[in-house]
Amino acid sequence: MITQFEFNKRGGVGTISVTANIAPKLCSEFQKNSTSKNDENLAKAKELDDILQPVHTAMFVESNPSPVKYAAKLMNLCDDEVRLPLVKVTEETKIIIKKAIESAKLI
């Protein structure tokens, strides 16, 4: 699987990111550094990518937008209500999301 870091490092530009809804600063900093040709910036981008990967993964354990809504709830940004046919994330997924956003120091 090619990550956003690898895509940008190979000359790709831009991203579509669910994670940016809950980690806009990290995602913005990652994007800025990962599109640089400077080795120092690319090293910083790799560090940020390592921080963000568990969050990216957690946002797709269940159907979007339920995981990001739950993460936003943990961050006191909104509630985790979703409309049918969507459902809230399971208790198992809540644990995965919480661990991921804690590891990224978002809460």
Task: Give names to the regions the model predicted.
Residues 2-3:
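Short acidic active-site motifs
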Residues 6-107:
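Structured C-terminal cap/extension of enzyme domains
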